[in-house]
Amino acid sequence: MKNKTLKNIASQRLFLPIFCLALVLLVNIITTPNFFSIEIRDGVLYGYLIDIINRASELVILAMGMTLVVSASAGTDISVGATMAVSAAVCCNILTGGERAVTAYANPLILGFIAALVVGAAIGCFNGFLVSRLNIQPMVATLIMYTAGRGISQLITDGQITYVRVDSYRILGGSFPGFPVPTPFIVAVLVVVLTSLLLKKTALGMYIQSVGINKRASQLVGIKSVFIIFLAYAYCGLCSGLAGLIASSRIYSADANNIGLNMEMDAILAVAIGGNSLGGGKFSLAGSVIGAFTIQALTTTLYAMHVSSDQVPVYKAIVVVIIVALQSPGFARW
């Protein structure tokens, strides 16, 4: 009876992501003194835990879009990191008026933000068209922007890092004056809530799962599978554009070589750790959120243990192997 109860608990969708996050946090508690200690400095919350929550914000946003892509198309969008770089470059180029560095906006801030989001969504639409209309494999289709994205960013910025040294630009990646909670975390929460409402209050969530499970059968019952897949990629592009804005705001610049670097792998891993099948179909936004925090907690832990940035991907790869093994049918039978 006891073994059956444990097996039922372990079979729950959120068991694996919660277990992984708890395991990483346990390691932090053992290795890092005062890990859960939180204090306020200059009106802003500080601490290891706050740093993880803050730094995971872009990944949480990306994971929302990636979850829909994986569920609808049984594929992944490996261009999200490059899309972040392009969106950041577009925003900063508009705000600087083409100059390398400014201390005052050349154009309205809202114009730069809207342009970045539109560009992100446009890249997502391009990917969605290739996958849904031309039936190109998702990884191959998104490989185009993965390869060309940073080159496009370099063209936009003339191969230089563009700086926007204006205090208001840093609010999106920092915090509002007098408000202790990091702005990126607030934005991430809003994206998660809005995505959840969109999928639960409309039939979109059901359609995405249906298309992911069986595209042909969905078409036969009247679901526009092509449009659903297209929409998933467009939304993923929009999320990437927003994440790019936050990343750019953190460093008040557009760095084509570093913004969004390796974020595509982290986003895919967050979705996988979240208990979502990479084969499409049913999905869990909550699982993806937990997966994103787990990845960021793991990254922060490795850096705290003085693991070099070159070696961090190796440890993440080990995690991928373990997660894939745990989700395999063979392990489930065992």
What annotation goes with each model-predicted range?
Residues 17-30, 66, 116-120, 146-151, ...:
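Hydrophobic core segments of alpha-helical transmembrane domains in multi-pass membrane transport
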Residues 1-62, 101-109:
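Membrane-interfacial amphipathic/re-entrant helices at transmembrane-helix boundaries
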Residues 108, 112-114, 122-123, 179-255:
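Helix-loop-helix "hairpin" substructures at the membrane interface of multi-pass membrane proteins
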Residues 134, 138-201, 228-231, 250-260:
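Transmembrane helix-bundle core of multi-pass membrane transporters
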Residues 240, 251, 255-317:
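Transmembrane alpha-helical segments in multi-pass inner-membrane proteins
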Residues 100-145, 291-294:
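Alpha-helical transmembrane segments within multi-pass membrane transporters and channels
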Residues 28, 45-98, 131-136, 271, ...:
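Single transmembrane alpha-helix segments in multi-pass membrane proteins
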Residues 1-30, 193-194, 213-216, 220-227, ...:
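Cytosolic-side transmembrane-helix boundaries in multi-pass membrane proteins
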